[in-house]
Amino acid sequence: MNHTRHGETVLALYPTTRGLGFVVMRSPLSPIDWGTRDIRGSGKNTQCLEKIATLIDAHQPDAIVLEDPTTPGGTRSTRIKRLVRAIAALADSQAIDVHAFARSRVVKSFEASGAKNRQEIAVLIAKRVPAFERFLPPKRRLWTTESARMSIFCAAALAITFFGPIEG
């Protein structure tokens, strides 16, 4: 399904072990707000939900977009799966549409541009959205952990998938 609902405010969220990345967009290449929220200590899901509630209050999104953590072969932790369900319940309680895309669907929406993995998708997004260029993390080495900034690009990829693929 191709969503071409430009003008609709979309909050894309990408929860991680360290917190979450988010992007707010009204069209596929025009972000309004973005960033990461670092969450430490116990009660990470509760803290994440509080941050998300603040984002919802600030931006009044028409839709929330998430990665589907239940996709067969997925590697999301049990905590993240619970958090995604809680985010969906929070959105439902505020009459906000929730859209969850499998990682394979996100990758497919960037196929025509030649991007096949997370890093290539992030590079493509940074080229298309100048505001994101300075946040592009360096290519991850096998022995390093993924940069927290990559969650911004994962969230942006989800939002762009919602609006429809970008070409070239």
Language model segments and positions:
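Phosphate- and other anionic-substrate recognition elements at nucleic-acid/protein interfaces
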Residues: M1-G168
